[in-house]
Amino acid sequence: MNNARPIHRALLSVSDKTGIVEFAKALAERGVELLSTGGTARLLAEQGLTVTEVSDYTGFPEMMDGRVKTLHPKVHGGILGRRGQDDAVMNTHGIQPIDMVVVNLYPFAQTVANPNCTLADAVENIDIGGPTMVRSAAKNHKDVAIVVNAHDYDRVIREMDANHNSLTLATRFDLAIAAFEHTAAYDGMIANYFGTLVPSYGDNKEGDEESKFPRTFNAQFIKKQDMRYGENSHQAAAFYVEANPQEASVATARQIQGKALSYNNIADTDAALECVKEFSEPACVIVKHANPCGVALGDDLLQAYNRAYQTDPTSAFGGIIAFNRELDGETARAIIERQFVEVIIAPKVSQAAIDIVAAKQNVRLLECGEWQGQTTGFDLKRVNGGLLVQDRDQGMVAQDDLQVVSTRQPSDAELKDALFCWKVAKYVKSNAIVYAKGDMAIGIGAGQMSRVYSAKIAGIKAADEGLEVAGSVMASDAFFPFRDGIDAAAEAGITCVIQPGGSMRDQEVIDAANEHGMAMIFTGMRHFRH
């Protein structure tokens, strides 16, 4: 049985008119009768195409400023009518079959993204007839093709040419899936927007202020990649990306060479890239198991890489390396000749670097593009039975935000290193301690249940690599609950500490710093990372 369906009549009604004229001309050239509405009909007519307006087809005018156009039995009967089963009813009521529906919806997302958008503006951009036609056509995909994406126009024409102006059931089914995805995302955006207009509520909220978090949280992600396995080999996994992901991310990066990215590769590459974005000077970040194990600045990338590698060469083995400048051939050669690396990512990769890395075919080389500003949106974390949603941690202090609470003032060099290692600490798993000196991390203590042990580990790592701690700065992602962390740092040779402050025992901690002759800086900002 031939499951292809010929396309004799198509209804076109689009808000985004990208490519619609060319598509309509291609349909007309293949003998397809065109029905259309409003602005789409006018545009096609202006281009010399023969178009029947839906109002002429139904005998019922558009009304209420265009709110009612296609909600008519002759339209939906033509779309929903089952060929071979509903033909008699359709003939009785003068309903002609519509074989293809080409619809995209009012620009609700763009409208509400405008900071000057009013509720009235939002309401007028809620499409009613469009989603109804889309769902009708998708439901009846056995007989009707629904096209909601402009990037499918060429595909449809190619298949029609290959199948005597017909589309196969497989194609119609795939287009129907895209249609349901389209309307689901659209309705989710509307629900999210209206859900933020109600008062905040919960045990920690008071008053009637609006909430940035909707009553129900709707998010749609598009599958980019199936994976061999997830975090562990017994876990199945896939990688999904946002419908319109921001540039300069692991989600949008171009893979130049190497094996497919694994689940852990993606997570670690994201951690490395987001950390290196914090720095304006040439920087290198090396990540292992989602924690920075080497971070440094330099006069150029080669110097930054050499210094970052020096932080912890053992952990750098099999790590992820991120840069904030174009990867040059000299730096690429230093990496390939020195260590095993899983992923290298940079905003741009020179041809010389590409040629050098090609000698190691399994190394994943990514080019992410330049970043223009901070990443927006929410961070999501699944818990059993729920979802935690929060703003991304975009907080960062400047020099003017710092409060020196010790008797001794930090030197200019200490202050510079304090700001450097504070940025690094933001990306280290809590409890996080970072030792730094001369724009280079010399010891990183991550993920310990007690802060003092993170401090001890940072000192041990520095000592293991022969890095001099004396005169270094220590950053802590959260306050010190006791003085023991300060005592451990002083014993290691730390002379300046930067931390949020805010402990009930702050004075005890400050007193410890003063006893050791250390400078202590409060940021007033915490950077827990779990």
Curated annotation (Swiss-Prot):
PROSITE patterns: MGS (PS51855). Pathway: Purine metabolism; IMP biosynthesis via de novo pathway; 5-formamido-1-(5-phospho-D-ribosyl)imidazole-4-carboxamide from 5-amino-1-(5-phospho-D-ribosyl)imidazole-4-carboxamide (10-formyl THF route): step 1/1; Purine metabolism; IMP biosynthesis via de novo pathway; IMP from 5-formamido-1-(5-phospho-D-ribosyl)imidazole-4-carboxamide: step 1/1. GO terms for biological process: 'de novo' IMP biosynthetic process. Keywords: Hydrolase, Multifunctional enzyme, Purine biosynthesis, Transferase. It catalyses: (6R)-10-formyltetrahydrofolate + 5-amino-1-(5-phospho-beta-D-ribosyl)imidazole-4-carboxamide = 5-formamido-1-(5-phospho-D-ribosyl)imidazole-4-carboxamide + (6S)-5,6,7,8-tetrahydrofolate; IMP + H2O = 5-formamido-1-(5-phospho-D-ribosyl)imidazole-4-carboxamide. One of its GO terms (cellular component) is cytosol. This is Bifunctional purine biosynthesis protein PurH. It comes from Vibrio cholerae serotype O1 (strain ATCC 39541 / Classical Ogawa 395 / O395). The lineage of its organism: Bacteria, Pseudomonadati, Pseudomonadota, Gammaproteobacteria, Vibrionales. The gene is purH.
